[in-house]
């Protein structure tokens, strides 16, 4: 079922124009700023947008201007992620999926994160995230669900990426919120 849903949602995403993505990203950013603005001097994980993903440059700027340490994922050991500090003056590097990564050696353990903002391909009605199918975030974030002080996990995507189905599996990352261009969904 996940393969079929992922394929359908990716087809919808690929039909978007750059203008569509830009306009819808701006609407999401306005909603997301309400949450990110409450984080000051914290450790925040974001992502660098790839094709047809919500653009979050304004959120990144807001988090940094509020004194937060911002981290982005980097692929290690072929199938896991580490989280490298993002510095505004560093040159980022494209990985094998054409996603920008930080060359920084300053890492943070997942236990040190306060806010996590994730891209999604889709989300089910219980808040389980559907990604591109590699399981990178699922493997790298699985420990946080055992933490006493779990970080807030926000998935951002377009409204059609929310599905009224249940496809979540025990290993899938569960979101606390999904922010779309039309609404905020609290799981």
Region locations from a protein language model:
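N-terminal active-site beta-alpha-beta segment that forms phosphate/nucleotide-binding
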Residues: 1-112
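Surface-exposed, charge/polar-rich loops and edge strands
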Residues: 4, 11, 111-116, 125-128, ...
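Glycine-rich, N-terminal phosphate-binding loop of Rossmann-like dinucleotide-binding domains
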Residues: 48, 120, 182
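Short glycine-rich anion-binding loops that position phosphate/pyrophosphate groups of nucleotides
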Residues: 50-52, 121-125
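Short, well-ordered strand-loop elements centered on a beta-strand within folded domains, enriched
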Residues: 78-84, 128-130, 153
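A structured binding-face within diverse protein domains that lines the active/interaction site
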Residues: 102, 119-121
């Amino acid at each position: 079922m996940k393969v079929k849903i992922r394929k359908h949602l990716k087809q919808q995403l690929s039909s978007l124009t750059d203008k569509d993505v830009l306009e819808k990203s701006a609407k999401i950013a306005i909603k997301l700023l309400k949450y990110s603005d409450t984080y000051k001097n914290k450790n925040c994980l974001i992502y660098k947008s790839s094709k047809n993903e919500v653009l979050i440059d304004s959120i990144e700027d807001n988090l940094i201007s509020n004194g937060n340490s911002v981290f982005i994922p980097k692929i290690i050991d072929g199938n896991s992620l580490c989280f490298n500090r993002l510095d505004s003056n560093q040159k980022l590097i494209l990985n094998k999926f054409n996603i920008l990564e930080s060359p920084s050696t300053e890492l943070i353990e997942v236990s040190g994160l306060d806010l996590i903002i994730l891209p999604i391909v889709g989300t089910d009605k219980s808040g389980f995230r559907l990604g591109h199918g590699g399981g990178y975030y699922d493997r790298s974030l699985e420990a946080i669900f055992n933490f006493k002080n779990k970080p807030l996990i926000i998935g951002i995507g377009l409204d059609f990426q929310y599905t009224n189905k249940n496809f979540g599996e025990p290993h899938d990352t569960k979101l606390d919120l999904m922010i779309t261009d039309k609404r905020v969904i609290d799981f």
